[in-house]
Amino acid sequence: MSTSHATPRILVIDADLDAIETARFALWRSHTACRFEWFDDAEVANASLLTQALCRSRDLPALILLDPRKFPGTEGYELLRTLCVYQQLAHIPLVLFTESPLCSDFAQEQDSRIWYAAKPALAADHMDLVTRCVQKRLRQPEFH
């Protein structure tokens, strides 16, 4: 197995390039061992992930951080649908960012496939949230 396949792939999908760069910097600063990849276009991300699923790629993301709200129309939600419907993608853990006051903030005790988190307005808080989400996921048994 090559080193690139042994290193967990973290995929951020967000229309906000600043949020993507903040996440990248947070993981770099925390020395989190991962391959950071991103899309700022939900349709392109959807096509890429769907192609990987249909080709039965073994190099799927270990975790996807997605903010579906800022994409035009329903693109972000169509991507979310793809991630939930296709069997090859349905096992990938997701962190969905939302501004809804009804969402539960990411907490250490959450253990479901989909985590919900209110996206912090401050970059430092966003960096902390991304780092905690990714590190918690990478500590789970399936990655050891």
Language model feature labels by segment:
Residues 107-118:
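As written
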Residues 1-11, 15-32, 55-60, 115, ...:
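Non-catalytic signal-transmission and effector/linker regions of two-component phosphorelay proteins
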Residues 24, 38-63:
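Acidic, metal-coordinating helix/loop segments flanking the phosphotransfer/catalytic sites
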Residues 42, 58-83:
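Conserved phosphotransfer microenvironments
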